[in-house]
Amino acid sequence: MNLKQKWDVYSRLTRIDRPIGTLLLLWPCLMALMLAAGGMPDLKVLVIFIIGVVIMRACGCIINDYADRDLDSFVERTRSRPLASGEISTKEALILFVILGLSAFGLVLLLNGLVVKLSVVGIILTIIYPFTKRITNMPQMFLGIVWSWSIPMAYAAQTGEVPMEAWWLFAANWCWTVAYDTMYAMVDRDDDLKVGIKSTAILFGKYDRQIIGLFQLAALACFIAAGWSADRGLLYGLGILTFVGFSTYQQMLIFDRERAPCFKAFLNNNWAGLALFVGLGADYLI
């Protein structure tokens, strides 16, 4: 395997070629940094968190594919993944995971002790998540914790503490993650039922759209509470309204529960997150 082929395998293993996950992690992290700083966060902290999000998303993808390597070949969307197709060995994948994980931890060591402690919890949660799909019908709820963990870390890095305001944002992102990852799980539901992978899309069954809607409403309420506790104004409110518009559009997309529209609804959440981030940023700047 030449260098170009190796890069292709690594980029697919870490999903560098598919940045949607990185972006969905990044928007709430950047919002947390802004809220904690009351505007523009410390540049050093900002750079560390952006790089850290990219690295930890890659780590999450590797450990997810390692856990699912014997099942991915039976699922239409995942059968071409490098571990499932045999393009890369499990040993090589785990070595890459360790290298990236240590790199991320090295960045965290540049910050305060509370952030370091929270980061240890974060990496443990990242490792545990893929295996929850074997034991519970609610892995998306565990993923919501994993994907929201950068929020208390961001507050800790910027202020040295994690105030109540941070937990409103944490709750908002948790609800939002459960909603959009259930849309994602709807894409694979038929295959997951065959191979025994558990998900909220299966758990919710015929009430999937309604329960996703409830999580979207809960996320909306908590995003509003987070903004309220930080005394945010009109422009953040416009971001919230745009988020509502995108959420409504997503409900329309998943109405018939077809694979392609459900996947499109999942991807659309990037724009919902961007709207919140831009609204918050504009509210501080203008």
Curated annotation (Swiss-Prot):
Membrane-crossing segments per the record? 21-40, 95-115, 142-162, 167-187, 210-230, 235-255, 266-286
Q: Which UniProt keywords apply?
A: Cell inner membrane, Cell membrane, Magnesium, Membrane, Transferase, Transmembrane, Transmembrane helix, Ubiquinone biosynthesis
Membrane topology type = Multi-pass membrane protein
Domain of life of the native organism: Bacteria
Q: Does the keyword Transport apply?
A: no
Q: GO terms for CC?
A: plasma membrane
Q: Which InterPro entries match?
A: HB_polyprenyltransferase-like, Prenyltransferase, UbiA_prenyltransferase, UbiA_prenylTrfase_CS, UbiA_sf
Cofactor requirements of the protein: Mg(2+)
Q: What is its EC number?
A: 2.5.1.39
Q: What pathway is this protein said to act in by its record?
A: Cofactor biosynthesis; ubiquinone biosynthesis
Which Pfam family, any one of them, does this sequence belong to? UbiA
Subcellular location(s) of the protein: Cell inner membrane
Q: Which family does it belong to?
A: Belongs to the UbiA prenyltransferase family.
- Quote the HAMAP family the UniProt record gives: UbiA
| NCBIfam families, sorted | ubiA_proteo
State the protein's name. 4-hydroxybenzoate octaprenyltransferase
Q: What is the lineage of its organism?
A: Bacteria, Pseudomonadati, Pseudomonadota, Gammaproteobacteria, Alteromonadales
Gene this chain is encoded by: ubiA
